[in-house]
Amino acid sequence: MNEGNSLRDIQKKITLPEEFNQPYLVSSYDDFTFLINSVWRQYGGWYSGIPSELKPPSLFEIGNAYIDMAGGKENLLLFLESLLAEKKYKEASVIIDAISAVEPDFYRDLKNSIYSFLADQEPSLMAKGIYNFNIDT
């Protein structure tokens, strides 16, 4: 934080020491990333260090920008499917959150696939619950 790193940068840089990689220390409820978030909020406050997150546009506005940039919702669907083929589910989840605000019915199945996959891969019960909660039935 004192070096000017953003929260996202810190989340990628900090890892637990190898001696904590023990079967009896596996976290099943929480996640190490969530602990980093808590420390950031305690000492750094609510600002993530990323200027675009200071006063962000709505997900609806971002979703429209993604759809326009792709040349339409069908092109964006193809792009997202290519991300999934490359196993880039987290990247796809950022986009699907925004475009689902614009076209929830059109992207519902893809959104459900993304969050179902992420939930299945997640060891943290907290993250698993959040991913599953966002699956539309």
Predicted feature descriptions by range:
Residues 1-137:
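Accessory terminal helices/loops
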